[in-house]
Amino acid sequence: MAVTCSTEISAVASGNSGAVIGRCANSADMKLYSLSILYKGATGARLLKGAYDVSSFSFFQRSSVQDFMTFTSQLFVERSENGSRATMKEQDYLCHLYIRNDSLAGVVIADSEYPARVCFTLLDKVLDDFSKQVDSVDWPSGNQNSIHYTGLDAYLARYQNPREADPMTKVQAELDETKVILHNTMESLLERGEKLDDLVAKSEVLGNNSKAFYKTARKQNSCCEIM
């Protein structure tokens, strides 16, 4: 499931580790796959709202793709510090993260061709809008059912074409890219001795079908490096 910024997840989405999901450098073909708002608590990250575009994936894989998007977004937030911006690269996909000092966080999962500057501007705008509409007292215990915020789908659709979204970035100060923490792979988020397989197995976000797809993809990927 490449959209979740993980080699294993890429394999899940394609159905086999040798498949490559094609994409073009044309801006019209750049893609945003998910936009999530989370709260970074003392014991983990809570998904408050999420919007997804999995239309480019096989119909039968879409549920698992979306599950792994959520899993990856939560892990990224949990392993990052408040007040930070970070980008995680895996294959041809990028996860962009911004955690405010008040523990409200946003994650965008995008095609690698999509401009990072636009992604971070989107996160700034979304978190600002969300914080104005949803009282902060509801964040620590909130979830997708209890939080009433309907703006994410519109943001995800509007920003699919970065050229249309780009004029809005002029409202924002230029982002100092030197302050963005870069992670080469999802594995770099793990602590010493920690295994992604174990996190997947213990995850409450992933359903049994998604975990089964992950295991199958891992087995296939162990003997094939074409991704």
Question: Which role does the model predict for each range below?
Answer:
Residues A2-S10, S14-D197, A201-M227:
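Acidic, low-complexity cytosolic segments
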